Amino acid sequence: MKIQHVLTAASLVALSGLAQAQVDPLHVRSWAASCAACHGTDGRAQPGMISLAGVPKEVTIQKMLDYKAGRVPAATIMHQLAKGYSDEQIVAMAGYFAAQKK
């Protein structure tokens, strides 16, 4: 089962350039802005919260897919939020946050 998760993430990363090229950057910024309440503006969180800025795209993609699929214990609302995004949106947002300075 773990291999399937890795293959899924690898496939999404491979397609990420294509996905980002097809997604309007303003849409990506808008989706990413919805993360600001918890993760800070452009992913730079306050102490005590997880920062997304500068996190490798592959890491964020895998984590979001894990939340979306219910593979992460429901300690936060992330499992519900992740279900609201398509895989392509997740890839685009992961690329956005990876490009932000820590």
Spans of model-derived segments:
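Inter-heme linker and motif-flanking segments adjacent to c-type heme-binding CXXCH motifs
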Residues: 44, 73, 100-102
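Electrostatic cytochrome c docking/interface patches
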Residues: 13-32, 48-50, 66, 101
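Bacterial N-terminal signal peptides that target proteins for export
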Residues: 1-8
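Gly/Gly-Pro-rich "capping" loops immediately C-terminal to redox-active cysteine motifs
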Residues: 28, 42-71, 80-85
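The canonical Cys-X-X-Cys-His
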Residues: 33-41, 93
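C-terminal capping alpha-helices of c-type cytochrome domains
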Residues: 83-102
